[in-house]
Amino acid sequence: MANTQAMTTSFKVDLFNAVHAFNATGIPAHTVSTADQFKAALFTAASTLNASTTSFTGATTEVSGAGYSTGGVVVTFGTAPSSTGTTSFLTPSASIVYSTVTLSVSFDAMLLYNNTNTGKNSVAVYTFTAQTVAAGTFTLTMPVNDATTGLLRIA
């Protein structure tokens, strides 16, 4: 099996239940004008992350190595979700950067998840060409925040 890129099914259900707060302008039931903290964790090429991955807690085979913190890095959402036509979209406002890491086991997936939520609910799985890093920086550059290329899109 392999990692498969997808917006997770559990995230779609979470949207109806107002589980996630991507910015401080919305007030879901679990917060009071406070944005949740989202994180991006890297997973090995031997993982099987996909649309059915419900949480960070339930995912296995996260990478490990010098300079890498379990759970990954914080993702910055500096702009509010938006929409154009029939598509809503949201993209982190900065690249996702893992600085000065050594990751010798091949990895090819990133799990975006809600670190504020007790269950560490998943949002999406993103895949890329398998990588290793030797005492370097691994950067995931974010696309333009629009209805065509935004990182999270719902049409």
Where are these regions (language model features)?
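Small cysteine-rich, disulfide-bonded extracellular modules of the LU/uPAR three-finger superfamily
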Residues: 1-108, 115-155
